[in-house]
UniProtKB/Swiss-Prot annotation:
HAMAP family, per the entry: Ribosomal_bL9
Organism ancestry: Bacteria, Bacillati, Cyanobacteriota, Cyanophyceae, Synechococcales
Keywords linked to the UniProt accession: Ribonucleoprotein, Ribosomal protein, RNA-binding, rRNA-binding
Gene Ontology annotations of biological process type: translation
Described function: Binds to the 23S rRNA.
Record's protein name: Large ribosomal subunit protein bL9
Highest taxon of the lineage: Bacteria
Source organism: Synechococcus sp. (strain CC9311)
Amino acid sequence: MAKRVQVVLNEDILSLGRNGDLVDVAPGYARNFLLPFGKAVPVTPAVMKQVEHRRAKEAERQATLKQDAVAFRTALDTIGRFTVKKQTGGDDVLFGTVTNGDVAEAIESATKKEVDRRDITVPDIHRTGSYKVQVKLHSEVTAEINLEVVSY
């Protein structure tokens, strides 16, 4: 088997790894593609020290983000119920459906904090009533909120 060389990636490469990862690659791949285009740097003690420093800062940043997410989940639990107003027809059937964007707007209006609509999991809602909605606040923190759909 051919000798492999270690490099530290300067950017995310789909088939290889993320920025700051230490990866083993073929010497030709490193020499002909990664190094000349600035996508990676060869491993040296100074580079390893920078990588460790970057990882420590990233771990600290992630811990702070997680604490903020837990605090926001507590705020969502304190509020308890969020209301979305939709137009209805007969028998409390909605014209359309409740979307992630509708829920994000309801959360934003109540908390004054923006939530990405892609992080909200809404069940199929076609009638007025109460529903449970999942909100992903962090990779390790999710909140379940009560959503009240009412007619206007």
